[in-house]
């Protein structure tokens, strides 16, 4: 067996005394063992992040730009290695894994460009009597050491969405990766080490939850950026004290399909949005509301599209639905489906488990209080519900503790803007599924879906602080 995978602190790889297994979620076989940090390791990582922050804030933007471009290039050069690792570690279908690597390359490339254009502002202060000679200049400065806690489902790009803007803004960052997928984050550490940044600019430290909570409460971190479940995110926020917090949490994304929509297109997009990567994304399509006049037609087309999606071995390029991340996830989803059926829901397709893979499952006759409707499924299950009036669909979609993204398929611009005004979400996507995300757009939600925004430019704003300079400009003598 290969040596246990070390973690990265202060530009050096360290072995820990405690090892944890990382298993292939499709085969269940051991993939690798990873060293996890002790309290002493955590203290070293925190201090390394603090020390690096002092150096990082002095780096000129051109140096940050070139370092981020090197990271993007390193990712691209090793793209096949990263993709294979994500397929083995996260069970991510090969085509999705390749797509994620390309997105991560773009995330670092975008961050490199944004490093050159962190904005400032000249503010006239002569609006009130007595301030005639005053001028203000506002610039954004690095916030300081950042703590990033990342999920399993995008083990590269969601790490990139914390690391890239942190470095672009002139900060250092400590990443605590998901216990199911630490290998991808550690491989990214190899690439970052070659970019010429100060030691400790990026530290990567797998650890247990108890130690992670100690990191969260440590006042030396000035910002926590967390992506994960709502329950954990809000619990951590309560422990953060004075530090700034960005939370990207869960969702149970809804879609509205109107009679004037391109029904074939909507069905095709909803199938991909609901079942890609086995529905293990926070913006996976979970609830579809279809106008009653087209409900039968849409459902027929949707079921045909879903039935074409191949489930199974994620290393097969034709696979769309791979394994769930672990047996607990599989059992939970089976339980929720069974509970919904016992409460009156009907299974239109799927509903069975094949080892670690759940069949694509479509349910009808669901109610808003069923777990499959009101909680985050995070699995390959989609509900289809008819409605009579557009306002009824808006109300139903809002009947959720979450508010991340929503899709509306219609050609009526008035209805699009009505949805934009009234849907309680972070983004409304017209004639597109809520699963869509561009890596430079502001991304985040409301209600239990989080606070703050990701997307490189938005994240840089969170990872910097405004600083004001006031000039009292008196006229030179003799003028």
For each feature predicted by the language model, list its residue ranges.
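Residue-level signal for inorganic ion chemistry
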Residues: 28, 64, 86, 108, ...
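Conserved C-terminal structural/oligomerization subdomain of aldehyde/semialdehyde dehydrogenase
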Residues: 27-33, 197, 256, 310, ...
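Proline-centered turn/helix-capping motifs that create local helix->coil transitions or kinks
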Residues: 109-124, 307-311, 347-352
